[in-house]
Structure formats: structure tokens, C-alpha cells
């Protein structure tokens, strides 16, 4: 996926990438956007896997807390066994096999909710006292309204071979992901060859230093 040249395997898998793209389009068209009456910040990227999204979410929550907000994190709970109808407020003592390891880690610092249905989790967070929500890995969550979308870009990973799954690491095209983002977080900024791409011209690029050690007390 992250080779500079397109491999034979990627070419052979390209028909499945077309199926993925069509499925994504159908999902987007059928999604009914739901809106909650507190601000919503979505954090994500176009690629599958780690790109610095989780530490970026914690960074954003830390800054929001400094500004007087009460942020709660909404996660899908990747790797966990929660069902589509369950909404779980994550506690640090919970089993990561149930709620997902990233959600478990984030719950040590800020109130964190997991559910396959993000909007149900958003309602629960608001009822629990949140006045702003940060959605982890939510650029492709078409059924919730976002006030701001933040794209997290790892300069080392870049966009890989720029092909859709399974031929490449992209969940959607670079153009689509960038077009719906207002802020662009740059990770590993010593290598930023892609930033001359014409798709990036409208993006507010905000260079940050993400410290993995977060010392805030839980809200």
C-alpha cells in the first residue's frame, strides 16, 4: 500500500476497489444526517489504520478544556465487541476486548463513549454534561452533522499509493476527504511532499506538536 509504485497485487485487486467505492457512495446517499444542538468536531483521515488520529483527539480535548469547554469523546470502539445498539461510557478498568483499546486509553483522560451508532452515543454524552463533542475517526460518518472536520495527515504514510481498499489504504478518494475538511493537522512534518497538492489550497494548515503524555485529570 505504501510503495511509491503500484504493485501487481494492487492492480489485481482493483475490481474490488470499485465495489468498495460504489458501496461507499450508496452508504453516503442513503445516510440521513442527524444533528445535535452542541458543537461537534470530527477528527479523521482517508486512510485505514493509524495516522495520529487518537493523539490528535486528546490534543483537541486538552485545548478545549483550557478554553472552558467540557469535551466528551465519541468512538466507534474499534476492536471491541459492543453491538450496534449499545452505548457504553468507557471506564479505565474495562476490558479492551469489549470497548476497544484506543477508547480505553482515551477514557483515562476524558469522558469517552463507544457505540456503533455515533449519534446515540452523542445524545448520551450531552445528557451526561458534555457541551462539545469530539468524534474519533469520523470523516466517513455520513449520518452525523459536524461543525468542523479535521483531517490528520501523517507525512510519512502520506496517502500511500492513492488507491482505494483493498488495492490501497484509502477509504475514500483524497479529493473527497480533503474537500470536506476545514483544518489539517500535520504529523511528522519533516516530510511533507504532498502539501503542494492542489486539493490542499483551501485548508487551514495547523502545525502541532503532539505530546503522548497527557497529565490532565479526568473530568
Q: Which residues does each PLM region occupy?
A:
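Conserved beta-strand scaffold positions in the cores of enzyme catalytic domains, especially
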Residues: 40, 73, 112, 149, ...
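Generic beta-sheet signal
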Residues: 41, 71, 131-135, 149, ...
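Walker A (P-loop) phosphate-binding motif
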Residues: 28-92, 192, 218
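Residues lining hydrophobic/aromatic ligand-binding pockets adjacent to catalytic sites
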Residues: 16, 186-219
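A generic structural signal for alpha->beta connector loops
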Residues: 37, 68, 109-110, 181, ...
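A transmembrane-helix-recognition feature enriched in membrane-embedded lipid enzymes
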Residues: 1-39
Amino acid at each position: 500500500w505504501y510503495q511509491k509504485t503500484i504493485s501487481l497485487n494492487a492492480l489485481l485487486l482493483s475490481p474490488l476497489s470499485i465495489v468498495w467505492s460504489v458501496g461507499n457512495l450508496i452508504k453516503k446517499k442513503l445516510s440521513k444526517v442527524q444533528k445535535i444542538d452542541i458543537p461537534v468536531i470530527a477528527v479523521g483521515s482517508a486512510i485505514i489504520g493509524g495516522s495520529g488520529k487518537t493523539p490528535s483527539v486528546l490534543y483537541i480535548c486538552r485545548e478545549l478544556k483550557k478554553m472552558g469547554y467540557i469535551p466528551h469523546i465519541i468512538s466507534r470502539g474499534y476492536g471491541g465487541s459492543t453491538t450496534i445498539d449499545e452505548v457504553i461510557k468507557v471506564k479505565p478498568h474495562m476490558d479492551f476486548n469489549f470497548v476497544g483499546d484506543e477508547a480505553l486509553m482515551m477514557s483515562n483522560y476524558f469522558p469517552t463513549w463507544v457505540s456503533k451508532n455515533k449519534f446515540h452515543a452523542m445524545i448520551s454524552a450531552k445528557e451526561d454534561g458534555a457541551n462539545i463533542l469530539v468524534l474519533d475517526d469520523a470523516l466517513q460518518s455520513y449520518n452525523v452533522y459536524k461543525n468542523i472536520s479535521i483531517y490528520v495527515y501523517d507525512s510519512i504514510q502520506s496517502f500511500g499509493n492513492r488507491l482505494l481498499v483493498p488495492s490501497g489504504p484509502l477509504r475514500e478518494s483524497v479529493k473527497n476527504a480533503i474537500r470536506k475538511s476545514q483544518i489539517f493537522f500535520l504529523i511528522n512534518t519533516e516530510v511533507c511532499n504532498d502539501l503542494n497538492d492542489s486539493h490542499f489550497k483551501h485548508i487551514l494548515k495547523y502545525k502541532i506538536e503532539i505530546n503522548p503524555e497527557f497529565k490532565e485529570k479526568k473530568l
